[in-house]
Amino acid sequence: MQQQHLMQMNQGMMGGYASPTTVTTDLIQQYLDENKQLILAILDNQNNGKVEECARNQAKLQHNLMYLAAIADSQPPQTAAMSQYPSNLMMQSGARYMPQQSAQMMAPQSLMAARSSMMYAQPALSPLQQQQQQQAAAAHGQLGMGSGGTTSGFSILHGEASMGGGGGGGGAGNSMMNAGVFSDFGRGGGGGGKEGSTSLSVDVRGANSGAQSGDGEYLKGTEEEGS
């Protein structure tokens, strides 16, 4: 009842003004400017002691304020309708963009699945790669051992030849040693680095012992002839 009474009072006050349906922002701005001027006039009237003019300006200011209040009361239904429209629009747009969001969410899942499948596929290839690496390492090690064995065979040959040359003391012993060394070196080259070096050392030592025994017999023969 009170609200209806207030609405009737507002309508009575708005009789001499424009109806709320024709209200524009320019009209509201005019009322605000007029109210500002009325307030300044009221203050001036109070300072100068003009009571009648002050009362008249106050009544007009109150009338304008009531009119603006009535306009404000008539606006909420329209604002409510406007507020409902964006909400409906948002709901429709949300329903429209839901498939796109679901597709965007499924895209990372598919990427994760692809990555996991790649991770599981890599260990299947790793044993083959390890085997190839082991074979390559073994082949490299065999080449290194073969080259090392050949080098050691030549060093043994050189050492035994020098020992034989120092211990023989005669041309026959050196010639026998050289013959045995070169012949055994030829055999060792065909049979392998390790076996060749062993046979070379044995033959060289045999040649040295033969040379020493030959020298002993020669000395014994000379002693018997002298006696």
Curated annotation (Swiss-Prot):
Gene behind this chain? GIF1
Q: Which organism is it from?
A: Oryza sativa subsp. japonica
Name the GO terms of the biological process aspect: leaf development; positive regulation of DNA-templated transcription; seed development
A GO CC annotation recorded here is: cytoplasm
Q: Which region is the signal sequence?
A: none
Residue spans with biased composition (Low complexity)?
124-139
Q: What is this protein called?
A: GRF-interacting factor 1
* A Pfam short name: SSXT
Subunit structure as annotated in this protein's UniProt entry: Interacts with GRF4.
The protein's job, in short, is: Transcription coactivator that plays a role in the regulation of meristematic function in leaves, stems and inflorescences. May regulate leaf size, length of stem internodes, and seed size by promoting cell expansion. Transcription coactivator that plays a role in the regulation of grain size. Component of a network formed by the microRNA396 (miRNA396), the GRFs and their interacting factors (GIFs) acting in the regulation of meristem function, at least partially through the control of cell proliferation.
Q: Does this entry carry the keyword Kinase?
A: no
Q: What else is known?
A: Plants over-expressing GIF1 exhibit increased size of multiple organs, such as leaves, stems, panicles and grains. 'Makiba' means 'pasture land' in Japanese.
Q: Which phenotype arises from disrupting this gene?
A: Reduced plant height, and short and narrow leaves.
Give tissue specificity per the record: Highly expressed in internodes, nodes, developing spikelets and developing anthers. Expressed at low levels in roots and mature glumes.
Q: Disordered: where is this region?
A: 124-160, 188-227
Keywords tagged on the record: Activator, Cytoplasm, Nucleus, Transcription, Transcription regulation
Family recorded in the similarity comment: Belongs to the SS18 family.
Localization (cell): Nucleus; Cytoplasm
List compositional bias (Basic and acidic residues) regions by residue number. 217-227
